[in-house]
A protein has these predicted regions:
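Bacterial N-terminal signal peptides that target proteins for export
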Residues: 1-7
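Cyclophilin-like peptidyl-prolyl cis-trans isomerases
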Residues: 3, 19-205
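Bacterial N-terminal signal peptides
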Residues: 7-17
Length: 205
């Protein structure tokens, strides 16, 4: 997964007409079934973000993320992108410097299947199309329903939600960006300096 591909798909997904017409979702969790949640902590240079991964509704995506967590492959990586959408937006991080740390791409779990939604606090996988997600992920600071799956667009797979640390998410989103780095739609969205991910680990519920 490359930053460039995610930029193109995301730009198409959040075009102004789509954002203007979509009704915002109200919950990052599927309400119909009790979820088995796996809590993890993302320790950053700006503070801690606690995320509950939804093993019940997004088992493939959760297992993939935990594979990276349990093998410490996120440790020392960065949040490298802050994309503003209206008064909110999203922050993106993952493995961008060493392809040897990447595992194989995973099957896509669309929001139409999981019942999870791209709302404030949701964690989702970046992708270059269905079945291409690997390590890169993003956390939403606001509802962006246009990132959910539709009949013609697989969207982005949500697999959990922030339970603590939204202040840190918003602080990263508000951090300085380079006016020149980034290609195409990514220009002006690359954090400078990047925000260090010190470690990611499982924590007790």
């Amino acid at each position: 997964m490359t930053v460039r591909f995610f930029a193109a798909s995301l730009l198409a997904a959040i075009s102004a007409p789509a954002l203007g017409q979509a009704a915002p979702a109200t919950s990052a969790q599927a309400p119909a079934t009790q979820a088995e949640l796996v809590p993890i902590a993302i320790e950053t240079s700006l503070g801690r973000i606690i995320v509950a991964l939804d093993k019940t509704h997004a088992p493939v995506t959760t297992a993939n993320f935990l594979h990276y967590v349990d093998t410490h492959r996120f440790d020392g990586q960065n949040f490298y992108r802050a994309m503003h959408v209206g008064d909110g937006g999203l922050i993106q991080g993952g493995i961008t410097t060493d392809a040897r740390k990447l595992y194989a791409p995973i099957a896509h779990e669309p929001t139409s299947q999981t019942g999870l939604h791209n709302v404030a606090g949701a964690i989702s996988m970046a992708n270059a199309g269905a079945g291409t997600a690997r390590s890169d992920f993003f956390i939403l600071a606001s509802d962006i329903p246009a990132l959910d799956a539709t009949a013609t667009d697989p969207g982005f797979a949500v697999f959990g939600h922030v339970t603590e640390g939204m202040g840190v998410v918003k602080q990263i989103l508000a951090s300085p960006v380079s006016p020149t780095k980034g290609e195409g739609a990514m220009k002006g969205q690359m954090l400078e300096p990047q925000i260090k991910i010190l470690k990611v680990e499982r924590v007790n519920p």
